[in-house]
Amino acid sequence: MQMASRKVIAGLMVLALCITTLSSAGSDVEAKAKASLKTKKISVKVGKKKSILIKNKTKKHSYSFTSSNKQVAKVTSKGKVTGIKAGKATITVKEVLKKGKKKKGKKKKRTLGKVKVTVTGMKKKNVATPTPETVNKATPTATPSATAPVEPTASATPATTEPAAPTPIVTRSPAPRPTLAPGMPELDKNNLTVADYPGIASDVPDLDIIRVGQNYYMVSTTMNLVPGVPVMKSTDLVHWEIVNYACNRFPDKDLFNLENGQQTYKNGSWAASLKYNEKTKLFYVIYNVNNDGFYCYTTPDIENGTWKAYYIQTSFHDPALIFDGDGMYVIYSGNNIQKISLKESSAEGGIGKVVKEGSSRALFNKTLGGFKWSLWEGAHAYKIGDYYYLMIIGSYGSWFRREVCYRSKKLYDSKASDWEAQLIFEGSTYEYGTGIAQGGIVDTIYGDWYGFLFQDHDGLGRVPSILAVNWDYVDTKNNKYYPDWPMMGYYDDKGNFVNCLGTSQKVKNPLTIQLNKSDKESYIVGDDDFSYPDFKEGDSLKKVWQWNHNPDDANWSVTENPGYYRIKNGKVAGNIWFARNSLTQRTVGPNFTSETCVLTENMKPGDYAGLAAISAHYGMVGVKCDENGNRYVFQGCNSDTNSGAKAKKEDKIKENAVSEEKIEGNAPVYLKIEYAFNTGKTRADKANFFYSLDGENWKSIGETFSLGFDTATTFM
């Protein structure tokens, strides 16, 4: 199967055009000397100026200069560059033939080249900044704004926004700033990474993130997919790759095996929490499976290790794990706490037990802070400095997501009166208009803090974005001070922190992260030629793959026909919902293409095989084998399109179109789906289907398929 982002394809096209241009320029080497740039790189300090010089200027031409980032460097019509703020920009220089001077065969305009500009230093301003003593401390119990949610305009196209200034180092934190450990890299201010929005344009919901050394690890909900709970790794908080899975396989139960009409769509591994315990030297992952129970997994090696499993048949909704002293605690359903311990299984490789220690209780009342939530979940718990922090998502209705923080200097032995509440983020991004919430915070080896929250993006799923965290925020406009609260927001064009506390407020700039940009381009999706020459029983496929529910290992293979993933019908299924051994990957916005080639000679009457787009429902392109054994390309979808749960055993594949060509022998059939995610603009996410019999000439087939997000069916 081949998967490629439209952005990657476009990048290759640009590279080819550059090569062509250089080749044609080479044919003019013997010609008269032309105007050219004297230098391709310049450096200028903030507030200073420097000119771009051109050799061999002529009176017949004028010259234009354009900056790629006017917030970093501006340029005049005479080529004089002014440094605005620290960062990098590119000045494009063009030569224009003056009016009336054009001769036959001569181009009126040509690009001389590009000058890379590095702006260094920050210009200091004599602006009085309020100190904590001159402003009022924020009242933690203030009632939040009840401004009506803002929906994106149907035809709105987000304006292009340049990255903001580098994040200032926070001057105050509830925990001491870390000392850079031996071997840790120094921060390179000229190689910082930039996070745009969304942070990851893919379905990565309910994320939780930790730092161990200079590495960041993140887990996410993958519901019914196996292996479950992907562990993603990054060194710069922007580029992520899947390195492991906590749950290699669900327990052998009907709902996980698609047996007897049971399934675990919209359930499965839900809202995982990830922690590292310095005392035990173990990584811990916990999650809840609705209608089944609570699971905990541990490993000493998060990237390459195997995981021990523990289970209890009880429910801890959206759990957060926190260690305090020698105690292990689960915060769940927003404000409840339960102390637990782990008991090893006596059987080798068996599942251990999660043991409740004492009874559970509520830490505080949900009305603390004057909040009246219709949604209250997604807990994340931390001990930072003198405080225990509990972060949750809250909503008054209309599904606008908000992030709320609760804190106390006591945890398990705390009283309700020990807790305070503060709304720390209420807003969205310039890219999309629904609220951002539910996630965690993480520090860097240099002492900066960032928040990771997610946002509903219709058919694309629930996508994460990164926000700046300020522990010492002074709101000069409203004369408020928020000491030791993790207020979230962004940095404006002047480098000032802006906190969002209203449904109409938006993050307006990408965020420059105080981390060295990774030189490794990592992705959570990828290609596969299904070549596994050393594959043996028990081995895994590439980390980008997940099965839909537990696989039936007796009926799939990558070794029987090397270079192909072989699926056998171990049982009859009337639809994709109950077809075992289906392989899946996430899609990536804004545009995405998935392709595969199938060999279908062994299909039997009534069989279907192919490529599907699954969201709230499914559409597919594939091969059908009719009652006479003839095979044709078809495009279809699920027949039950009601708004309720659609993943039913009784549902049948609805055929929307069938090709005229009959497939003979073992002739390859090439299938393709093109995705266009337009959330935030038209909110119309679409998929179109294509097939080819030679791999080169593609034909469109069937209907355009509308993608959507539905909590009643897949929750993806």
List each model region and its residues.
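Ser/Thr/Gly/Pro-rich low-complexity, disordered linker/stalk segments of secreted
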Residues: 123-179
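C-terminal segment of classical bacterial N-terminal signal peptides
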Residues: 19-28
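Carbohydrate-active catalytic/glycan-binding domains of CAZyme proteins
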Residues: 144, 154, 166-170, 174-716
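Generic detection of short hydrophobic beta-strand segments and adjacent strand-loop junctions
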Residues: 17, 40-44, 50-52, 110, ...
